[in-house]
Design a protein with these regions (language model features):
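Intrinsically disordered, low-complexity, charged/polar segments
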Residues: 1-196
Length: 196
């Protein structure tokens, strides 16, 4: 389903039905990302926009790729928050249980292993450490990376929004040309009617 339009005849004039699909290359998937989720996003955006020509097809692919990138970066930022919380947890557990046990408990907690989660909750409660404080400390530990990812997310969203504006501008220009052509045809028809 990596072609841009699932059914070109539903979206394009009959004259374009026999054109080969434009090769945009494979989906820009990172390790662990699911191709069918990307394809679903591509299909839904294509159906919403209904690209009318090759330029709009290119912009739709850009919009999908940039939306996918922004979603990936948001997941990355959430992952960095988890990494930061794990690091903060390990630092807070070291004086309580020792270096090796703190590392193991923090890894298990980050992996959401039930036994590790329970042990961590007990140690935190017994020592008056709130999870919110660990999250804040973890944010501080990863703040530079999270800020960079946030800037990258904003840049991807800005590029996506620019592509959306290009489609709108392209359609406005096309509509203006079509109106002018209709007006010219009507004027020609009126002149022919007066001449006869």
């Amino acid at each position: 389903m990596n072609s841009l339009i699932a059914d070109p005849s539903a979206h394009a004039p009959a004259a374009r039905e026999n054109l080969a699909p434009v090769p945009f290359g494979p989906a820009p998937l990172a390790e662990g990302e699911v191709a069918c989720a990307y394809d679903e996003l591509l299909l839904r955006i294509s159906c919403a926009v209904r690209p009318a020509d090759i330029f709009e097809e290119i912009w739709v692919r850009d919009i999908v790729d940039l939306t996918w990138e922004a979603l990936r970066l948001r997941r990355l930022a959430a992952g960095l928050m988890t990494v930061g919380a794990r690091r903060a947890l390990e630092l807070d557990l070291r004086p309580l249980v020792g270096f090796d046990q703190a590392r193991g408990m923090a890894r298990g907690w980050a992996a959401r292993e039930p036994m590790a989660v329970g042990e961590v909750a007990e140690h935190l409660a017994a020592n008056g450490i709130a999870m919110e404080n660990l999250a804040a400390k973890g944010l501080g530990l990863e703040l530079d990376s999270i800020e960079r990812v946030d800037r990258m997310t904003m840049a991807a969203e800005a590029r996506r929004n620019a592509a959306l504006r290009e489609i709108d501008r392209h359609r406005t220009t096309l509509a203006r040309r079509l109106r002018a052509a209709v007006a010219e045809a009507e004027a020609d028809a009126a002149e022919e009617g007066e001449a006869s």
